[in-house]
Amino acid sequence: MNYCYDSPLIWPQIDIPKEEIFVSESKSSVKPEEIGSLTPANTGSYHLYRFVHAFEGAECSSVVFLHTIPGYQSPIKERMLYSSCKGNLIDSLTRHYGIEIQRKLEIEDFKELTSVFLIDTLHPKEVETPLSFSRPKGPAGRGPRRLIR
């Protein structure tokens, strides 16, 4: 079963006493700006979000893994569990469920999570690097450099 394509937002959580990951909620139609209002501000969490958007005239669907870090508002054990389980969760989502995750983001404040932010993150603008100064060649006929001791 592929959860991510049935609903755009999946909310896996860790049961701290049992140290197990389970899917606590899923939502059907959620905009990126609304995810913060669904999440408690004082606990860490994971979100698997399918972001459907238009880019350069084409319809795109990208899966984004969000790891919420509430700062120092949550207990240390909870922060450590969420940080240490992230890699295994992503690996199992990829291997067992076949979910291809385009971006993995760590977010401390949901105010920065907007559609524009996700589009810029998923489709970064290519920056042209200016040509750097190329050093001119030395005079011809001087021979190879010698090491003087």
Feature locations, PLM:
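Long, low-complexity regulatory segments enriched in Ser/Thr/Pro/Gly and acidic residues
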Residues: 1-63, 67-149
